[in-house]
Amino acid sequence: MGHRLTKIYTRTGDTGDTGLGDGTRVSKDSQRVHALGEVDELNSTIGLLLAEELPAGVRAALACIQHELFDLGGEVCIPGHTSMSERQVSRLEALLDDYNRDLAPLKEFILPGGTRAASLAHLARTVCRRAERALVSLSRAEPVGTAARKYLNRLSDLLFVLGRVLNRAGGGSDVLWQRGKTIEKGKGGREK
């Protein structure tokens, strides 16, 4: 097993730099640290979703995904290290196909919302897209594994589908986008 922290604070980052997994020091605002932070925020957002009542299969999948995101973070934290594989990407694709099979085809865009769990899945999806963009930016400057980028792309798709699944499981439905909808006079204003 890797390095264990016996002390939470080290004071080594007080000057604005931090240590990567290979021991090199970089600025805390470097692209690599930024991408790592985005993946960490994604994992935390999925943890928030896991605090909700979820179907057992969704819970098991998300719990596994949290571990895989830690692996992905390890890959980002150690330049040149690869921990993500095409097998993990394929597994997400299989989950996507399985969950999407039972959903009605979409005729319109849907809004992020519905049940609390579905809304959190959509929030996780948007955080995942941000993490993916950060990883793509990093890959333009330094080598990044293609499986890691693909994984985040598929994960955001899965989180979208899970938002729909969770709305259905919670007795709700997709919130359909209504083109051109505006606030009507006398509705949606301040309550008196």
Residue ranges and their predicted role:
Residues 1-192:
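Phosphate/pyrophosphate-binding loop motifs in nucleotide- or prenyl diphosphate-using proteins
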